[in-house]
Amino acid sequence: MKHLFVSILIFCSLLANNLNERVITIGGCVTETVFALEMGQNVVAVDISSSIPNKVTQLPQVGYIRGISTEGILSMNPDKILTTTEMGPPKVVQQLKDAGINLKIFNAPKNYDDILSLIDDVATFLDVSKKGEQLKSELIELNNQINELKLDKPKIVFFMSPALGSYNAAGSGTRADYLINYIGGENIFTNDFKRYTKVSKEDIIKYNPDIILTGYVRELNKKEVVDIFKNSDEFQSVAAIKNNQLYGVSVGEVLNFGPSFVNTSLNLIKKINTVE
C-alpha cells in the first residue's frame, strides 16, 4: 500500500509539472499541429507566422521565425521550445541551447508527406501518439478525396499579398508552387523564375491564367486582394476573370503546411469545380 501511495504521489507530481510547463511554439506548422493534437494549453507565446487556430493570434509574439531574438524568448521563461529547421539565426539557436532550455527542432515540412511526418514527430515528443494517429487518419481521408477530385491541369498563378500595380508571383521551389501542383494545376511561372518575383500586368495577360489565387495574411484583406484583379479593366480579358475563377486564400492555411493545408486544398478544389 505504501508503494502504491508513493507511486500515486509521483504521478500526480509529474502531471502537475506538465500542466504548469511554459511552452513556446515557433513556426506556424508547429503551432497548428500542437493545437490540433489538443496540446496547446501550455503554449504561452508564438512567432508571427502562427495564426491557426485563431486564438493564438492573441498570445504574445516572439518575432519572425528566421529572425528570433534570444532576449524575446528568455523573457517568456519557457520550459520548452518547439520549432522547425527554419528557425534562425543560428547563433540564437545555440544561445538557447546553452541556456539549458529544452529546444526541440523538427524538420520543416515541404509537402503532404512531410506534414504527416511532423504530426508523428510532434505527437511522439508530446507523448500523444494516439491522437497523432487519429489526426493523420483524418488527413489521409481528405487526401484521398483530393486525389479523386484533382483539377485537370489548369493554368494557375499565385500572388502573395498583391497590391495595385505590384504583383508578386510564386515561381518554382515555393510552397505556393507545391500547392498548385497538389490540387492538380500548373504554375504559369514555374519555368520562368524561382521563389517570388514581381511580374508585370503584361506578363499576366500574356500567360492568361485559368485560375488566379491571391494570398492574404489577414481576413479583412481577403476581398481587397481579389478586387485588385476583379475590378481592373486591364485584366478583364484574362480567362480567370472572365470565368470567375479568382480566389483569395489564407497564407496561414496554405503556406504554413500545418494540418489545415489538406482540408483547405480540398475546399479550394471543390470551389473551383463548382464554378460554371
Regions from the PLM with identified roles:
Residues 3-14:
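Sec-dependent N-terminal signal peptides
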Residues 19-35, 131-183:
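Basic- and aromatic-lined ligand-binding clefts that recognize polyanionic substrates
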Residues 21-76, 80-86, 188:
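A short, structured surface patch at a secondary-structure boundary
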Residues 21-22, 114-124, 133, 144-149, ...:
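Structured C-terminal subdomain patch of bacterial secreted/periplasmic proteins
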Residues 47, 173-196, 216, 248:
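His/Asp/Glu-enriched short active-site or ligand-binding loop at hydrolase and phosphoryl-transfer sites
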Residues 52, 90-121, 125:
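Flexible loop/hinge segments that line or gate small-molecule binding clefts
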Residues 62, 67-83, 101, 200-217:
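Proline-aspartate-enriched helix->loop->beta-strand connector
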Residues 91, 108-120, 155-175, 223:
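Extracytoplasmic ligand-binding site segments that recognize negatively charged/polar headgroups
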